[in-house]
């Protein structure tokens, strides 16, 4: 028996890569997946694949690099009477180059997605998880969080935030039956 059976799992950045793979695997383990990303076509294709295998999937198209998008997503999901047992903050990206090679809007968008939206989603869903008697959060960071990386200063710093933030809230909510972890792919 899977610990994910009948759990509702929100996965950001679900249209490709790690998010896509997590959605497929969690479906196999009996979870009901709530998929979000910018790419509507890819999300619907994944949802149809999951449904064809007998699983349950919901699609919410949202560009999480935009300020206020976390609250918009939260409200959309609530409006469909869906609760979230497990939040997987997977959406994120990095750009490479010297710091001054980026325009302010470029790095602001990266920080909005990698740091602010991730924090906002945790802030929105933690009270619900407390009321539900428990839950889980997986924040996808990176091995880049473990050391400063020249030409990836903003990306590696944003992922260091993800790691430290995850460790801090893990401690804050451990006595409320909420498990929090940072996943650090790469290397």
Residue ranges of each PLM-predicted region?
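Substrate-binding pocket helix/loop in short-chain dehydrogenase/reductase
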Residues: 98-99, 103-109
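Conserved glycine-rich Rossmann-like NAD(P)H-binding loop of the short-chain dehydrogenase/reductase
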Residues: 29-46
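Conserved glycine-rich cofactor-binding loop
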Residues: 8, 15-17
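Active-site helix of classical SDR
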Residues: 122, 158
